[in-house]
Amino acid sequence: MVLKRKGLLIILDGLGDRPIKELNGLTPLEYANTPNMDKLAEIGILGQQDPIKPGQPAGSDTAHLSIFGYDPYETYRGRGFFEALGVGLDLSKDDLAFRVNFATLENGIITDRRAGRISTEEAHELARAIQEEVDIGVDFIFKGATGHRAVLVLKGMSRGYKVGDNDPHEAGKPPLKFSYEDEDSKKVAEILEEFVKKAQEVLEKHPINERRRKEGKPIANYLLIRGAGTYPNIPMKFTEQWKVKAAGVIAVALVKGVARAVGFDVYTPEGATGEYNTNEMAKAKKAVELLKDYDFVFLHFKPTDAAGHDNKPKLKAELIERADRMIGYILDHVDLEEVVIAITGDHSTPCEVMNHSGDPVPLLIAGGGVRTDDTKRFGEREAMKGGLGRIRGHDIVPIMMDLMNRSEKFGA
């Protein structure tokens, strides 16, 4: 009888990078000491993957949709809905959801799009104050997510989804006016303008910001709203398509939401924050535990992306080393003959760009049944030589499922 293996997909968010002078011309992944991933590279196979298509910078939402095997051009209906699912909200198809950043506004200019990366606890307290004190004449839900992130849901307003953002997407610029394309979205734009104004009044006087002022930290006195989203068009759940039980170990709301939308059970172990202070070993232990009961486990590690956005190459390398130790724990507790492991990023976040780019992402697959190549280390340049070649993100899961002996033959 053919062995049906388990699958473990590990995403190191924003993993891919470009050569950096500060790192002697290496990328953070090449600069980092990664004995466990290098061991897997030696016994596995490397390649590169374009989350969407070559040269196309991918959002974390569209990238994960693609990596889970979906066509984002067909399924994607905006980021906000995934954010809302990720914070545990069960929404209807009539609701309109948005991603929100707590930000710092000084003299009409956004000086910090993440309000000094305020903590999750601070964001949740500020969100509760806004929910309790702001009245805009329509039903809404405002809830803190991870770190500086929050979610806004306008109940019953899905027809106004053609509304723009007020986020200029870089510091040093004023907030944008909400654009709109029709009467429904014009109404939503007006509601959002009122919401932002009233929320700002609450934030300016909140004790958290009074304390941050005294401490010389950026205050969270403004809301940047983006990514209007309605119910995604998911034709078939991941679990139905592949006939597997699937679980995710995830801290970040957006990625939780994508996983929930396609049928994953989602777990967030204590100490897993999605921030620099996350407890990656708690994630490793949870993944090992879940592999006993689930056929396919997805583990998401966020901080590498944040270091790219913050242009901190040495920190990004250190975080990759932490992720490698996390992977080492997993390797000590699984039988590689019975598990197929894939490691990649959802996209590249080069430090010099401080944002997502269209660079391909290194990909490693190892475990039972995997053909090997001649690569010895996991890095961008080694990945170019790998036997997998250059594939698209949506090819990863089918390749894994085939190696797990869970794919069905096409044709007679």
From Swiss-Prot:
The keyword Kinase does not apply. Its EC number is 5.4.2.12. SUPFAM superfamilies: Alkaline phosphatase-like (SSF53649). CDD domains: iPGM_like (cd16011). Keywords: Glycolysis, Isomerase. It comes from the Archaea. Pfam families: Metalloenzyme, PhosphMutase. GO terms for biological process: glycolytic process. Pathway: Carbohydrate degradation; glycolysis; pyruvate from D-glyceraldehyde 3-phosphate: step 3/5. It catalyses: (2R)-2-phosphoglycerate = (2R)-3-phosphoglycerate. One of its GO terms (molecular function) is metal ion binding. Catalyzes the interconversion of 2-phosphoglycerate and 3-phosphoglycerate. PANTHER family: COFACTOR-INDEPENDENT PHOSPHOGLYCERATE MUTASE, METALLOENZYME DOMAIN-CONTAINING PROTEIN. Belongs to the BPG-independent phosphoglycerate mutase family. A-PGAM subfamily. NCBIfam families: apgM, PRK04024.1. This is 2,3-bisphosphoglycerate-independent phosphoglycerate mutase.
